[in-house]
Curated annotation (Swiss-Prot):
It comes from Salmonella typhi. The chain crosses the membrane at residues 17-37, 54-74, 91-111, 140-160, 173-193, 212-232, 240-260, 274-294, 311-331, 338-358. It is found in: Cell membrane. The lineage of its organism: Bacteria, Pseudomonadati, Pseudomonadota, Gammaproteobacteria, Enterobacterales. GO terms for biological process: glucan biosynthetic process. The gene is mdoC. This is Glucans biosynthesis protein C. Pfam families: Acyl_transf_3. Its EC number is 2.1.-.-.
Amino acid sequence: MSSVPAPREYFLDSIRAWLMLLGIPFHISLIYSTHSWHVNSAAPSWWLTLFNDFIHAFRMQVFFVISGYFSYMLFLRYPLKHWWKVRVERVGIPMLTAIPLLTLPQFILLQYVKEKTENWPTLSAYEKYNTLAWELISHLWFLLVLVILTTVSIGIFTWFQKRQETSKPRPAAISLAKLSLIFFLLGVAYAAIRRIIFIVYPAILSDGMFNFIVMQTLFYVPFFILGALAFIHPDLKARFTTPSRGCTLGAAVAFIAYLLNQRYGSGDAWMYETESVITMVMGLWMVNVVFSLGHRLLNFQSARVTYFVNASLFIYLVHHPLTLFFGAYITPHISSNLIGFLCGLIFVMGIALILYEIHLRIPLLKFLFSGKPPVKQESRAAIG
């Protein structure tokens, strides 16, 4: 445990907040994309599909790197039990709050919008359970994964800490090229695991809880650990905050490969396995792209930025049902995809900000949506 706080990483706070807020244009553009979602526009837009695919290809990989970075930073600052308790509360309480207040009403709304209310009694017990697992966890899945990663990382972080205490500080002798190879192999390993599961017991891949708890956690754990290593080794972090032409070009090529796989791949063949390899290495390269841009443009203290950093989790939690409401009841009345997309941004962001300001004035809601007890002020701690 260290009593000396690490310097404030303003650019990482900002990047994490903007990555979370990117969920708003991501889901609104999903309405107007060629991808089948809960609600879709009458005619899809190719450029909004492209925009949607780009966000989806890297956003959460970078997010989990930052989460791992802050998690290890706080691991060194607090006793183990206190660290685990605070970390789980910060993500677990908002997740459990959002299920009855947000995703359950969202599920009921979709049942009526998609005219599935009459079919519900005909479903088997497992089908009802699995439907509820997908629909109630919904966009909260990353909070569940963070709870799991926090618990799993206890042993890993303890080992890291012991190595730091017993070994002399030394540079992380690994280049971005070596990291790229490692993440490529990790992508292949993940793809192999998925293919084996697909061959042995394909039905389990459609199980919501298995997908969230096992498959998502397996995919994102390398990025979470990479974030912790970036905190341990400043030279490794410097590799990410220093612009790399190779990473930029690699990310561009990987995104083209991602689009081609989306266009020509088949779910019954190797599309998902190929995607896991592509997004694993693209996620690594985009860490460099995003970190280097953020370090140059966002590494400063600003009251406005701090406001959105603090508001980002709440806004993300409430934006999803607002987006679905917009898609179901307002999108059909707007013929232009561009105007509809812009109106969606204004509608969702505007209402989300109003709700955020209201919840700040109600201590119980403020606690439930932040996981922070009202008697404690730990504004320096990170949420994920």
